[in-house]
């Protein structure tokens, strides 16, 4: 009898450890659409020490003086999390969010590209603030998540707005 109870407890502990291990040490990725249908890539990471992170990235094609430019913006937001069964309580520190903006200029001669490079680099700091605000404001709430399902390569969570969001390990 004692051996059966011990074996059952051991199996339960092992299952819980495997379940917890499935969440940590991976980058969970998904693509969401904003109000304009623009794709926003989101990645979540959870570490065993209780830290977590969120990476939000988007690409925007635009024209500057008739010249096609592709902007790529990414916001990295650090945080921490606590897991209580199927509940994930995340605290993301938007104040410590870091923004990176990169760009590609298409179809230009080298001389004009250098001039446009200087102009764009001057506007990057303004763009960083705008992208940070737009990306953080446009995101679904990720503070209180309920794990709907957790598999080795797929995580489905439900947020406070009752949206189910699937994430995948790539």
What kind of feature is each model-predicted range?
Residues 1-23:
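Bacterial Sec-dependent N-terminal signal peptides
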């Amino acid at each position: 009898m004692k051996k059966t109870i011990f074996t059952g407890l051991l199996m339960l502990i092992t299952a819980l450890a495997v379940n917890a291990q499935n969440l940590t040490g991976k980058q969970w990725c998904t693509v969401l659409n904003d109000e304009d249908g623009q794709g926003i890539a989101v990645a979540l990471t959870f570490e065993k020490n209780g830290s977590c992170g969120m990476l939000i990235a988007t690409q925007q094609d635009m024209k500057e003086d008739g010249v096609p430019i592709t902007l790529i913006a990414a916001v990295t937001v650090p945080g921490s999390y606590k897991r209580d069964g199927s509940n994930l309580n995340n605290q993301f520190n938007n104040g410590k969010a870091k923004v990176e903006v990169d760009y590609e200029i298409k179809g230009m001669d080298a001389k004009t590209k250098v001039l446009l490079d200087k102009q764009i680099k001057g506007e990057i700091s303004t763009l960083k603030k705008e992208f940070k605000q737009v990306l953080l404001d446009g995101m679904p709430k990720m503070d209180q998540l309920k794990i709907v399902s957790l598999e080795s390569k797929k995580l489905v969570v439900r947020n406070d707005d009752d949206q189910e969001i699937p994430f995948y390990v790539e």
